[in-house]
Amino acid sequence: MKGLIQRVRGARVEVAGEIVGAIDNGLLALVAVEPEDTPEHADKLLHKLLNYRVFSDEQGKMNRSLKDIGGGLLLVSQFTLAADTRNGMRPSFSTAAPPALGAELFDYLLQRAQGQHPDVASGRFGADMQVHLVNDGPVTFMLQI
C-alpha cells in the first residue's frame, strides 16, 4: 500500500463539478492499493498518516503530527501510484490491486480513519476526480507499507 502525502493549507475533491470532500489545514493522501495488501497494511498506513511528524513546532522543526495539530485528512484513491514505470514509455498497472480489492481496502481505510480522527474527508473511489490543493511548503512524502 502506498500513500503520497502532501501537507496542505486546504484541499478539495470534485466529481462532475460537485465537491465531494474538502479539508482546511492538514494532509492530502493519495492512496494506492497493491495486490498483496491486507487490512493490516491499511491500519499501518493510517497510523503513519495520523502520527507522521510533518507539521512545524514552535522552533520551525517538523515535529508535530496531524493528530497533534487537529488537522484534516483528505483521502483520495489513486491506483496510478501503483504503476510499474520501469520499462517502456507507457505505465503498466499490473502492479495495482484489482478494482474490487482496491475499493474494499480503500473503504476500510476510510472507515477506520473516520473512527480515529475527527476531520476526515474523501474522494469517490473509481471516479474521474479533480483535486484542488494549496501545498504548504511544499512538503510531500511517499509512504510505503
UniProtKB/Swiss-Prot annotation:
Superkingdom assignment: Bacteria
Gene designation per UniProt: dtd
Catalytic activity from the UniProt record: glycyl-tRNA(Ala) + H2O = tRNA(Ala) + glycine + H(+); a D-aminoacyl-tRNA + H2O = a tRNA + a D-alpha-amino acid + H(+)
Locations listed in the record: Cytoplasm
Protein's UniProt name: D-aminoacyl-tRNA deacylase
A Pfam match: Tyr_Deacylase
Motif (Gly-cisPro motif, important for rejection of L-amino acids): 137-138
Predominant location category: cytoplasm
NCBIfam families from the UniProt entry: D-aminoacyl-tRNA deacylase
GO biological process, one term: D-amino acid catabolic process
Disulfide bonds: none
Recorded domain comment: A Gly-cisPro motif from one monomer fits into the active site of the other monomer to allow specific chiral rejection of L-amino acids.
The keyword Cell division belongs to this UniProt entry's keyword annotation: no
EC number: 3.1.1.96
Organism name: Pseudomonas entomophila (strain L48)
Keywords: Cytoplasm, Hydrolase, RNA-binding, tRNA-binding
GO cellular component: cytoplasm
Gene3D superfamilies xrefs: D-tyrosyl-tRNA(Tyr) deacylase
One GO MF term attached to the UniProt entry: Ser(Gly)-tRNA(Ala) hydrolase activity
Function: An aminoacyl-tRNA editing enzyme that deacylates mischarged D-aminoacyl-tRNAs. Also deacylates mischarged glycyl-tRNA(Ala), protecting cells against glycine mischarging by AlaRS. Acts via tRNA-based rather than protein-based catalysis; rejects L-amino acids rather than detecting D-amino acids in the active site. By recycling D-aminoacyl-tRNA to D-amino acids and free tRNA molecules, this enzyme counteracts the toxicity associated with the formation of D-aminoacyl-tRNA entities in vivo and helps enforce protein L-homochirality.
Subunit record text: Homodimer.
